[in-house]
């Protein structure tokens, strides 16, 4: 599956956050959270300082919101994590990041650079341990989202969904079950499944990607859109309809 390295996904997300902010401020927030006073305020956050995209402030009370946007929820995925800092927490990922840096320094032809990065990516995914995977998921996905309200917007229909991340099956599995990488046809990505104490296999639609943030062209200096590119770890949510169905009564439309 192709993914954007030109900044268009980020720009689209910013537009969605602005529209969602206005929608919540005009009354949707009080419908979701009836205890809010008349003086509540929806504040734009995001950037490098905040995990939450939006924040509802009402006196001493705060509601943290992670906003996810899809044109069609039946197509594509959204990110739980897109981080270069997480690369430091596994020897396999460190080696991938070092390979990316080396390719950037030597600036070989595009195809040579792409092949080197893809090979390093596949090796990293194939060799990361279950222990490292669980540690990264706990630190960078569960902990950073456990107090978050997740809001999914489908722009083609105008539908919105809201749920608490700490009530989700994914959060429960990250905290209590064993994650495993399932290698398939993808070179730089794989599914992440979980096993419980009874050896039941649980699929929450989680995918891991080990890639560069701005693509190969930026890495070797041939891109006009970006001048640098580094190794990043992504966890993505596939199969959004299944996610919504699995939450059952814990998710609501607004």
Regions found by a protein language model. Name each.
Residues 23:
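Active-site nucleophile-adjacent alpha helix/oxyanion-hole segment immediately C-terminal to the catalytic cysteine
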Residues 3-11, 18, 26-28, 60-225, ...:
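Catalytic cores of nucleic-acid endonucleases
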Residues 1-2, 254:
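Non-Sec secretion/translocation targeting segments of pathogen effectors
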Residues 26-59:
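A short acidic/basic microdomain associated with nuclease active sites
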Residues 225-254:
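Protruding loop/beta-arch "assembly-hinge" segments enriched in small, turn-prone residues
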